[in-house]
Amino acid sequence: MHKNTYTSVMKIFRFIASLLSITLITSCSSNENSTPSYKSFNEYQVVVDNSIKWPEILNQEEKSYIIFFYSETCAYCHEMQEEVVDFAITCPLKTYFLNVGENAVPIDSDKKIGITNYEEASINGTPSILEVENATITANISGIDDCLTYLNEQRLKQN
């Protein structure tokens, strides 16, 4: 009798272990929450309306404006997508958008400011923001944290 009880307990234990293994395997292979899905930047009308090309970065009509550099493959760009789109819609400082995947944008670790010729300009990667005043780059910000801080500071100045 003792041997039968032990055998029954072991069968139940193996059954439960099998169920747990199956549950673990199926939950790990689920794609539902593994990769967040983001909207394309071009799904926002403000991005479409305010998109510019690399040679145009220093010759916009406004005296002061910013350019947000993004890539559709950049997770950090998508992470701050709602914030930068909201900024572009609600703040008086004009925001332009430049998709580095569609433009040959020079990438350089030297954050150049004081540049007045687009051929000398560069960004440090995506996401990045260039601030332009009187056709001169006055700020060159890169990285999600610094870009979000910059947008918040500008929002406070504008309001």
What do these predicted regions represent?
Residues 4-16:
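Bacterial N-terminal signal peptides that target proteins for export
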Residues 24-27:
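C-terminal motif of bacterial Sec signal peptides marking the signal peptidase cleavage site
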Residues 29-63, 152-159:
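N-terminal leader/targeting and pre-domain segments
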Residues 53-96:
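Local sequence-structure signature of Cys/Sec-based thiol-disulfide redox active-site neighborhoods
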Residues 72-76, 102-105, 136-137:
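Solvent-exposed loop/turn segments at secondary-structure junctions
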Residues 93-112:
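Thiol-based oxidoreductase modules, predominantly thioredoxin-like and allied folds used
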Residues 106-126, 130-136:
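Structural alpha/beta surface segment adjacent to cysteine/selenocysteine redox centers
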Residues 124-159:
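Non-catalytic, surface beta->alpha helical segment in thiol-disulfide oxidoreductase systems
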